[in-house]
Amino acid sequence: MSLGIMEEEDLAEYFRLQYGERLLQMLQKLPNVEGASESPSIWLLEKKKETEIMHQTMVQKKKMFQRRMETLNLRWEELGVKEAQLKAHIQKSEQFIQENDQKRIRAMKKANKERELKCQHMQELTKRKQEMVALRLEHQRLSAKLKDYYIFNKYLEKVVENSEFEEIHEVIARYKTLVSMRHDLMQSAQEGQEKIERAKARLARYMEEKDDEILQQNNELARLQMRFDRARSNVIFWESRWAHIQNTAAKKTLLLGTIKMATLNLFQIVSKHLKEVTEVALEDTHKQLDMIQQFIQDRSDIWAEVKKKEQQRVRI
């Protein structure tokens, strides 16, 4: 039996099923009236008393059953409250564990990051030491070169004395400027040549593409001419076919209108049976068919349930 609150009819049905067969057996065991005591009135009073006692017993059992069901309902509600409290406690515990895991993960990430930074700093320090050694070696190499280039410095000093320049760095700057200008001119010439080559390549591709397009257009023109000739030769056939299509479309349109009208009539009948306002548009045939189908399905389910109950009554 369900733990929910039972209706009076359900309780009556339950007690009828539980005690009806037992009462029938007890009644069958009763002695025949013809073979009973000579005082039928006394016998009837005794049986009436037994019937009242049995009725009171059934009423008491019914009350006890109702109280038991109420107790079970209360226990069920208490279990629901305890279950909700347990779920809340589990959720809080999971949230607390998740927060601790997140803190632990952040701490581990921070420690890993600090170790990585320390390792990077050590690598950077080693790299700087190596660069310092390399710079010292470069300084020694440049110092040696400076001694080797001392003769060239003397030569440049003489050049300054016999030219328009006043300092050696002006001569060097002028030389660097001329070298840079020569490099720029050569680069510009190379870029110009590359542009010319690219333009030639684009022109060749353009000419080739246009030749291909002309050939494709000629082929397309020939194909369209053939299609035009075939269409012109079959114009009578297609005109008759078009007339047939129009006639068929008119019949289909008439049939569709008939179907929509019949569907609308059925929908209005269903709406009257349902006794409720529907917001279905008159032209929404699909929605109307859906509601008609649902109405038929509901009535079929009701009829099946009625037949099932009738069969149960027949068995009882």
Curated annotation (Swiss-Prot):
What's the protein called, per UniProt?
Coiled-coil domain-containing protein 42
State how it assembles.
Interacts with ODF1 and ODF2. Interacts with CCDC38. Interacts with CCDC146. Interacts with CFAP53.
Answer whether the UniProt record assigns the keyword Coiled coil to this protein: yes
Q: What does this protein do?
A: Essential for male fertility. Required for sperm development.
Question: What family does the Swiss-Prot or TrEMBL record give for this protein?
Answer: Belongs to the CFAP73 family.
Q: Which organism is it from?
A: Homo sapiens (Human)
Q: Where in the cell is it found?
A: Cytoplasm, Perinuclear region; Cytoplasm, Cytoskeleton; Cell projection, Cilium, Flagellum; Cytoplasm, Cytoskeleton, Microtubule organizing center, Centrosome
**Which residues, if any, are the signal sequence?**
none
Q: Please give the PANTHER family that the UniProt record associates with this protein.
A: COILED-COIL DOMAIN-CONTAINING PROTEIN 42 (PTHR21683:SF8), COILED-COIL DOMAIN-CONTAINING PROTEIN 42 LIKE-2-LIKE-RELATED (PTHR21683)
Q: Which residues form a coiled coil?
A: 39-146, 178-232
The family database entries (Pfam families) matched by this protein are listed as:
DUF4200 (PF13863)
Looking up InterPro entries in the UniProt record yields: CFAP_domain-containing (IPR051147), DUF4200 (IPR025252)
**Keyword line:** Cell projection, Cilium, Coiled coil, Cytoplasm, Cytoskeleton, Differentiation, Flagellum, Spermatogenesis
GO BP field: acrosome assembly; centrosome cycle; cilium assembly; spermatid development
